[in-house]
Amino acid sequence: MWSLDHTMMRVEDLDASLDWYQTYFDYEEKGRWEADTFTNVFLGPEDVHDDGALLELTYNHDGRSYTMGDAWGHIAVRCDDVYEAYDELMDAGVEDYRDPDSCGGSYAFVTDPDGHEIEIVERDHGAKWSLDHTMIRVEDAEQAIGWYTRKLDYDLFRREEFDDFALYFLKPENAPEEAMSVELTYNYDGRSYELGDAWGHLAVRTDDLHSAWETLMGRHAEDYRDPESCDDRYAFTKDPDAREIEIVTN
């Protein structure tokens, strides 16, 4: 219950974004929803794990533009060797953004056509380019950790604390290594963040939408968009930083 299902981001040119992810990350289309005013496309590696997460691209047909904000940080994708993976992307034509040497040799970053940051991390598990984590910035670490652990039963399985910031990684108890985690970044200087609208939501999956919603309401999660308001197909709550969390069914 509550496994991370996907991360949604909004794109201004669907064809350009699909071409980018399919060309450079070898992603394939896993699902598509064509509505009158928008299109949602779900992407992931061919051999994504059953408990792995997908990337959802949302394209609104009215040609709107988006602001990135700074409350969302990045998605991270897996590879065996960060230097080899970065060189592969550079040779294929991806723009040079933050190479491994500029990141201490342990990770790197590129950006997609809309400017969403994508971290490249070394892992000994999961399909190449599969989603490892999604990073979000939080204004109160204790409150955010408490929300994800109490509302979603997540475990804090990794923490890194530095002089001026800290990183906390959470995902469901007993989740496989291949499952995506959420990374909470907390800066000690008390700064505030803007959500923007280039990022949409995190989605968690459950077996029973209505039972899950009742559990969340019993744990005093925000009643934002209940199942009935979403045609009993999904629902939305929000975390303490007003970030949307979608609930979907397996």
Language model features with spans:
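Short glycine-enriched loop/turn motifs at secondary-structure junctions
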Residues: 1-3, 67-72, 102, 128-130, ...
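Core segments of cupin and vicinal oxygen chelate
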Residues: 2, 8-52, 136-182
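Vicinal oxygen chelate
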Residues: 6, 31-32, 42, 77, ...
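Residues at or immediately preceding the N-termini of alpha-helices
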Residues: 14, 82, 141, 209-210
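Active-site/binding-pocket entry motifs
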Residues: 49, 62-64, 175-176, 189-191
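Short, structured motif recognition centered on aromatic/hydrophobic residues
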Residues: 54-57, 72, 131, 182-184, ...
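Acetyl-CoA-dependent GNAT
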Residues: 59-61, 122-125, 186-188, 250
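Acidic/His-leaning functional-site neighborhoods
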Residues: 181, 185, 193, 212
